[in-house]
């Protein structure tokens, strides 16, 4: 009897459907609490979705940087259409075997390259200081590529120095 409570998970469901349609990907299941109750308990409005992406052996990417001297690129867009185009470029490069590692950006590029660098203690030097390195970028991907490409934004390069360098600032990853 509370439309606002029903509206929250329903809006989340519509948002999830929109994301699936935009990315041409499907969720395989989920759970909702549309009614806000379970037996005699009050339950907050909730929507949980899960999905899998079946891959062939060799198609799986990890997040840790792999080698010194590789370019690191940003795949992102400001509009849904640009985001979809960036995802398609990234996917084509991954299927061609050119993506060595990748990270789904959450809390900014600085966090992404710091976490990617920690796995194999490979450093990173930023080459693009125009970007806001600390701004959230939902839907963006940072990728280490084995070859140079012209259809993505190059943000830096992997280095032998065990540090993340953003302009004059540097942070050790040791």
Label for each model-derived stretch:
Residues 5-47, 93-174:
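Glycine-/charge-enriched secondary-structure boundary and capping motifs
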Residues 1, 20-23, 28-31, 50-56, ...:
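Glycine-rich anion/phosphate-binding loop at the beta-strand->alpha-helix junction
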Residues 41-46, 56-74:
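Acidic/histidine-enriched ion/cofactor-binding microenvironments in catalytic or ligand-binding pockets
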Residues 3-6, 84:
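Conserved strand-to-helix beginnings and helix N-cap segments that scaffold or border functional pockets
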Residues 50-57, 76-87, 106, 127-128:
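A general structural motif
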Residues 66, 74-102:
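A glycine- and small/hydrophobic-rich beta-loop-beta segment
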């Amino acid at each position: 009897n509370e439309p606002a409570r029903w509206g929250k998970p329903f809006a989340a469901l519509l948002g999830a459907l929109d994301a699936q349609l935009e990315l041409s990907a499907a969720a395989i299941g989920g759970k909702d609490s549309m009614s806000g109750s379970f037996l005699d308990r009050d339950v907050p409005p909730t929507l949980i979705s899960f999905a899998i992406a079946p891959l062939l052996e060799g198609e799986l990417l990890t997040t840790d940087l792999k080698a010194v001297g590789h370019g690191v690129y940003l795949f992102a867009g400001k509009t849904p259409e640009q985001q979809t185009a960036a995802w398609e470029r990234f996917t084509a490069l991954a299927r061609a075997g050119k993506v060595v590692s990748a990270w789904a950006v959450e809390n900014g590029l600085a966090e992404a390259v710091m976490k990617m660098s920690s796995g194999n203690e490979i450093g990173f030097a930023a080459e693009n200081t125009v970007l806001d390195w600390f701004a959230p970028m939902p839907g963006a991907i940072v990728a280490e590529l084995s070859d140079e490409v012209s259809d993505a934004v190059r943000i830096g390069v992997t280095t032998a120095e065990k540090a993340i360098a953003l302009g004059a600032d540097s942070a050790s990853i040791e």
